[in-house]
């Protein structure tokens, strides 16, 4: 017999995200008083192919960034259609909202409106069954805790400093479990603060909790991180690997070259590939995200041919959590991993479809936050539900980031002996 609990009410409100910008929060109540609440994140460096985040564009309110239109779309357009539907029928609810919107990129109702409802429905359903969200989405096989990909030095569009590359991250591949992984990362983070301080560099933190010092070169960021790893008593390569998010789309020029605007250096796509290969040869780098632009398919092919069997090549702007873009990438043999951001596509169903497609093609999936976050920790549950093996959700600083890590600690505790921490096995597709 199919279990049926109707959705009684859907309500949205405008709240603030971690950058002080408005975002959408949705509450779904199912019969019996089961409540699901979800809030929607927002990115600073966004891919051109992402689903549309609806903003009011009213300059007299929140400098044009209000989301009252999206909130109204939930309360007046989506709610009347979704109320009465089965809270367990996630696919049907998501499909109804996609059809209601009727555009390929959700620009009519807004991906921020649709996603808020989608996630809140899943949370209400989990609540009704008395399950953790990760168990509801992932079932009995949801047991893999992700290796954190922790952003501890920021540059690019995320920081007003001299560093062109957007994110330098640490990955505690030598940890035995998630709890230990988190401790190791926190210790490196605090040691990095000491290293930067000793060099007279800034220790103020950016949007994602990482430091944003003015460095002489981008490469120096890797060097100070490795110094901090050693100071914390760990071994680079064994205990920690480095991950980089280049956000190269931000550097891409109309003539097909790449401009490192903070240091006034221009590189061809071939030189970009050489640059990454050189860094990957010198340092214990395991992952490179958006090493070339979302538009540069030829550059992606060169990069994948050169480094695709050695390190993880993550498509973020390239794939935008979109199965059509991912399918094209798989057919062309570019990248070997996809970054998963729920708000790039706008529903839980489409997010899970993208992860499934990636896994079937032998691509890894990295569950990710956005630079504008809230206290909502849904992505922690999604990472475990899908056994994705990796999560990117900022430094161990700022509650909007730490909320996700703390939720993963709770999940690991709840899973007990069943919990698995993959370490280097997360990169099953590398030689």
From Swiss-Prot:
Keywords: Cytoplasm, Glycolysis, Lyase, Magnesium, Metal-binding, Secreted
Catalytic activity field: (2R)-2-phosphoglycerate = phosphoenolpyruvate + H2O
Domain of life: Bacteria
Required cofactor names: Mg(2+)
Record: residues binding Mg(2+): 245, 289, 316
Principal EC category: lyase
Binding site for (2R)-2-phosphoglycerate: 166, 341, 370-371, 392
List of catalytic residues: 208, 341
Main location class: cytoplasm
Cofactor: binding details: Binds a second Mg(2+) ion via substrate during catalysis.
Coiled coil stretches, renumbered: none
GO biological process, one term: glycolytic process
Its EC number(s): 4.2.1.11
One Pfam family per UniProt: Enolase_N
Compartments it resides in: Cytoplasm; Secreted; Cell surface
Pathway(s) this gene product operates in, as recorded in its UniProt entry: Carbohydrate degradation; glycolysis; pyruvate from D-glyceraldehyde 3-phosphate: step 4/5
GO CC, one annotated term: cell surface
MF annotations from Gene Ontology: magnesium ion binding; phosphopyruvate hydratase activity
PANTHER family in the cross-refs: ENOLASE
Family to which this protein belongs: Belongs to the enolase family.
Purpose of the protein: Catalyzes the reversible conversion of 2-phosphoglycerate (2-PG) into phosphoenolpyruvate (PEP). It is essential for the degradation of carbohydrates via glycolysis.
Name used for this protein in its record: Enolase
Classification lineage: Bacteria, Bacillati, Bacillota, Clostridia, Eubacteriales
Gene behind this protein: eno
């Amino acid at each position: 017999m199919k279990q049926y609990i109707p959705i009684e009410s859907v309500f949205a409100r405008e709240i603030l995200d971690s950058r002080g910008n408005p975002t959408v929060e949705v509450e779904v109540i199912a019969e019996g008083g089961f409540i699901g609440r979800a809030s929607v994140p927002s990115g600073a460096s966004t891919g051109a192919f992402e689903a549309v985040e609806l903003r009011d564009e009213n300059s007299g309110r929140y400098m044009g960034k209000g989301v009252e239109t999206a909130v109204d779309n939930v309360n007046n357009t989506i709610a009347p259609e979704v109320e009465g539907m089965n809270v367990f029928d996630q696919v049907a609810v998501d499909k109804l909202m996609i059809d209601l919107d009727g555009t390929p990129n959700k620009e009519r109702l807004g991906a921020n409106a649709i996603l808020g409802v989608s996630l809140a429905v899943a949370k209400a359903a989990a609540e009704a069954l008395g399950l953790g969200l990760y168990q509801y989405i992932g079932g009995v096989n949801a047991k893999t805790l992700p290796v954190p990909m922790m952003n501890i030095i920021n540059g690019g569009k995320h920081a007003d400093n001299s560093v062109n590359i957007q994110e330098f991250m640490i990955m505690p591949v030598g940890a035995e479990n998630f709890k230990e992984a988190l401790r190791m990362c926190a210790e490196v983070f605090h040691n990095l603060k000491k290293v930067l301080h000793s060099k007279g560099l800034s220790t103020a933190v950016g949007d994602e909790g990482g430091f944003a010092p003015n460095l002489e070169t981008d490469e120096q960021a890797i060097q100070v991180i490795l110094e901090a790893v050693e100071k914390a008593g760990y071994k680079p390569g064994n205990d920690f690997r480095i991950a980089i998010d280049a956000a190269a789309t931000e550097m891409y020029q109309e003539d097909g070259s790449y401009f490192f605007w903070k240091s006034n250096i221009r590189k061809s796509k071939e030189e970009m590939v050489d640059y990454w290969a050189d860094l990957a040869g010198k340092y214990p780098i395991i992952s490179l995200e958006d090493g070339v632009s979302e538009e540069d398919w030829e550059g992606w092919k060169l990069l994948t041919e050169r480094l695709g069997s050695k390190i993880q090549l993550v498509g973020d702007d390239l794939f935008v959590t979109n199965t059509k873009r991912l399918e094209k990438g798989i057919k062309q043999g570019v990248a070997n991993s996809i970054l998963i951001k729920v708000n790039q596509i706008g529903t839980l169903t489409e997010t899970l479809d993208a992860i499934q497609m990636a896994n079937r093609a032998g691509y890894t999936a990295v569950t990710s936050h956005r630079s504008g976050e809230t206290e909502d920790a849904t992505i922690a549950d999604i990472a475990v539900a899908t056994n994705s093996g990796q999560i990117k959700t900022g430094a161990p600083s700022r509650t909007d980031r730490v909320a996700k890590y703390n939720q993963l600690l709770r999940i690991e505790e709840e899973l007990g002996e069943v919990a698995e921490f993959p370490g280097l096995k997360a990169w099953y597709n590398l030689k």
